[in-house]
């Protein structure tokens, strides 16, 4: 029994120690907790929330902990607001940086509008001033010097036209009539019309003419610059062709070994070409005709060179003509078109002349190859070789004359002479064959070089 009583006492004592002590702090906390529960329950009571009792409101408002919590929440809200404001400001900064160019553009537009308004106002003021009698007197005074300047321009244009006619009246070849001679006549025929037009125009149209003249002069300068470029290109092409011809001649010159017979056949080939052009047949046989034929071809080349030089001089004279000679607007374009057509005709004529020249050179090369295959080197017995060559080519046969002068006295002498003659023929034949082989090789090389040069020239023409 005692043990049970002791255990019961111990349990009661433990319970007593475990119970909390009611202090004033704990009482205030319990009130606050009850009020908080009441507020939560009232706020959650739906659909009709209950109002909080005034005692709970007083306790909650008087508790510093709740006030600090509420203040902390307010601080958080304020911090959130500040963060949002900072983000907005950061987002607005690049927009602000982009705004100044727009503002500048707006300012520029405003300035332009102001300038336009000011210019419009100036024009209006000028119009009103021009309508006044003083302005009319001023215009009349300004028109007098403008007329003087126009007359001076006309005099200078006439002097330049006279100089241009003097330059263009030089000797020109009649083989190729040039249409370039029409340009000064056109300028002369059209310039009086322009002079009369300028005289008949009213003074009010003079400013408009002064405004149009720079455009016409610019068009004429462009046309002249294009003509100069085309002329330079032509001159460069001619120089290149002349250099190629000189190189081909230098290559072909040392390899050819002209002999008396080859030179005679060479001149005969030139004469045959000149026969086609209308020359007499007697020049192909006589020795004097050979020299005449050899001099005729260089003279033709000189005439053609002089013709080309005169054409270039005429074109330079056209370039040097004053701008006042060319009519303005569509007339200037027509003249440019005519000049282009004339240049095309000149190019075509030059191409035809070059084709003829190369065809002649090809014919001469073929004749030389055919001749040198049958020719041989010089031998001590010149008369025998000449007789052999004349028989091979079918010219006048001096064989009977040699036989008449060479008459053997006896049969033995004739037999010995025949044997010597046959031996000489064999020796000459072997020597001729060797020489012919060498010449054939050299001629084949020359022909190959000529073909290469011809192909290059054709490629240059096409290009």
Swiss-Prot record:
Keywords recorded for this protein, A-Z: Amidation, Calcium, Cleavage on pair of basic residues, Cytoplasmic vesicle, Disulfide bond, Glycoprotein, Oxidation, Phosphoprotein, Proteoglycan, Pyrrolidone carboxylic acid, Secreted, Signal
Sites bearing Methionine sulfoxide, chain numbering: 384
Keyword ATP-binding: no
InterPro entries: Chromogranin_AB (IPR001819), Chromogranin_CS (IPR018054), Granin (IPR001990)
Pyrrolidone carboxylic acid PTM sites in chain numbering: 438
Superkingdom field: Eukaryota
Glycan attachment positions: 430
Presence of keyword Calcium: yes
Chain spans, region Disordered: 88-440
Pfam families: Granin
Biased composition regions of type Polar residues, renumbered to the chain: 196-208
Coiled-coil ranges per UniProt: none
Compositional bias (Basic and acidic residues): 134-160, 301-310, 331-340, 348-375, 409-437
Compartments reported by the entry: Cytoplasmic vesicle, Secretory vesicle; Cytoplasmic vesicle, Secretory vesicle, Neuronal dense core vesicle; Secreted
Positions of post-translational Glycine amide modification: 329
GO process terms (BP): defense response to Gram-negative bacterium; defense response to Gram-positive bacterium; mast cell activation; mast cell chemotaxis; mast cell degranulation; negative regulation of catecholamine secretion; positive regulation of cardiac muscle contraction; positive regulation of dense core granule biogenesis
A cellular component term, taken from the record's GO annotations: neuronal dense core vesicle
Biased composition (Low complexity): 92-116
Disulfide partners: 35-56
Signal peptide segment: 1-18
Phosphoserine modification, residue list: 119, 220, 282, 308, 350, 383, 410, 414, 430, 444
Family the entry assigns: Belongs to the chromogranin/secretogranin protein family.
PANTHER family in the record: CHROMOGRANIN (PTHR10583), CHROMOGRANIN-A (PTHR10583:SF1)
Subunit structure: Self-interacts; self-assembly is promoted in vitro by chondroitin sulfate attachment which occurs at mildly acidic pH conditions. Interacts with SCG3; this interaction is optimal in conditions mimicking the lumenal milieu of the trans-Golgi network, i.e. pH 5.5 and 10 mM Ca(+2). Interacts with ITPR1 in the secretory granules.
Remaining remarks: Binds calcium with a low-affinity.
Record's protein name: Chromogranin-A
Gene for this chain: Chga
